[in-house]
Amino acid sequence: MSIVILGGNECMERRYMDLCQSYRCRAKVFIKPVGGLKKKLGDPDLTIFFTSTMSQKMVQSALRELESCDTVIERCHTSSLSALRSILEKHAG
């Protein structure tokens, strides 16, 4: 399963990837806004928004890019490992 994580904390980026790997998922993590998001996102099975650490502009931009993709979008206000773990249990578990 491929996962894209948007938002979150910079210091947790590696931990997000390791946790996804433990669920046998490939993860891409974008903490900061990046240009050309559509090309970098690919076609993920699950997209996770950590909304507390994302600007509204980044959320809207990402949603526009994901309209044409067949992906599940999960929004979470907190960007903790336990929040990510519960999302992964629900979708990849």
Language-model segments: residues:
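Short, charged N-terminal beta->alpha structural module
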Residues: 1-24
